[in-house]
Amino acid sequence: EGCALKKIFQVCIALLLCFSLVTPAFALDGIWHNPYGIDDLYDHEPTEIYPLTPIAGEMIYIKSTTWPIEPGQSVWLTYTKNGEPQQDVGAEWKYNDGNNSYWEAAIGPFAQGDVIEYTVYADKDGQNTQSIGPFSFHVVEWESAQSVELGSQEEGLVVLNVTPDQGDSTPKLGLSFPSADVLRFQFSPLGDVAFEAGAADYSIEEDSNSIIISTSALEVTVTKSPYGVEVRDLDTGKLLTQNGGTGSELSWLTDGAGLVKNFRGRYESPSSEKFYGFGERYNGIEKRGETVDIYVYNQYQNQGERSYLAVPFFYSSKGYGLYLDSTYYAQFDMADSDPNQYTFTVNTSGDDPVLDYYIISGTPEEVIGGYSELSGKPQDMPKWAFGLWMSAN
C-alpha cells in the first residue's frame, strides 16, 4: 500500500512539473470599430473613422481597438474601391489603455465619387482571427457655383440655372420675396426640387452681366459670371451684404453622383460689422471673430459656445438679419478664419437636399419680427407656467 501511494505521489509531481513548463496561450477576445461613434460633436471615441466625412485627396484613418492587451496581436484592413479588391493595409499600434490596445490604419487618398467598403481584422500569432464590418463610405468634394443664367420666372419666383465649377450636374437657385423686405434663397444642387414662391411683387431687369430684381424695399443684383449677389436696402440706400469673385460664394459637398453632404455660403464682411444672435449663449452676445455651432448640447459647466438653445439666426449691425432654415447641424464662422468674410456650413438630409435661407432687412425690431413671421410665434403659456421655477444645480 505504501508503494502504491508513493507511485501516485510521483505521478502527481511529474504532471505538475509538465504543466508548469507549458506557456499559457491567451486568446484574442475581440476587436471593435465604430465609424461614427456616438454621433456627438464634442465627444469622439478612439475607434472612429477620421475624418468623419472623407474628402477627395485626403488620407483616411480607420481606428480600432483589440482586447486584452497581449503581445503577438496584428490588425489589418481588407477593402474594395468601387467594387475592386485593393491590397490589404496593416494597422499601426498606437497605445494601450486599461485592458485595450488601440490601432490605426491609413488608406487613400481617393477621388470624388469613389465608394470604399472595408472590414477590420485582428489575430494573435496568426491564429484566432476575428473581424468587424463591412463598413462603407462615399468620397466627396466641394463644388461651387461658377456662373448663373436666368432660367424661368413664375409668379413670385425667379429661378436661375447654375453652372458648377466641375461635374455635369444642373443646379438651380430660386430667389423669392415672402415680403418686400425679406429675400429668400432656395438652392438645389441636383436641380430637381420644386421651390416655394413668395408673396411680394417684384420687377426684374437683365443685361449681359447681371440680373436685377427689385421690390419696394430691396434691390438684389446677381452677377452672372463669376456668380455673386449684392443686396441693397432701397429705403436707406445702404448696401446690406454682398459676395462674389472668390468662387466659393455658394458651395456643396458632393460625391458627384447625387449624394450631397453639406452646403456652404459666404458673404463679405467689413471689419466694422458686428453680429448678434444664435440663441442662448454664455460667452457674450457679439460674435464677430468667433465660430458658432448650431448644435443642441447640454453642457453642465464651462459651456463656452455650447448651448441647448441654439438658433441659426443672427442680426448684423449693417441693418439685416440672416436666418438659415434648417434643423440640421450648422456652423457659422463669423470672420473668425478670415477677417473679411463670414461663412455658414450646414449638413443635409442626403435626400432631395435644399439650402434654404433668408436675408431680412430693417431695424432690430423689424428684423426680429420678420424672423418670427418665418419661424413661427410662441403660444401663450398656461397660467401655471408663470409660477415658481426651481433648479437643483
Range-by-range predicted roles:
Residues 26-182, 186-190:
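Glycan-association/targeting regions that enable binding to alpha-glucans and other polysaccharides
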Residues 1-4:
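Short, Lys/Arg-enriched N-terminal segments with co-localized hydrophobic residues
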Residues 7-14:
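Sec-dependent signal peptide recognition
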Residues 16-21:
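Hydrophobic core
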Residues 144, 164-166, 205-383, 389-393:
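Catalytic and substrate-binding clefts that recognize carbohydrates or anionic sugar/phosphate headgroups
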Residues 162-164, 172-226:
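Contiguous, structured surface segment used for ligand recognition
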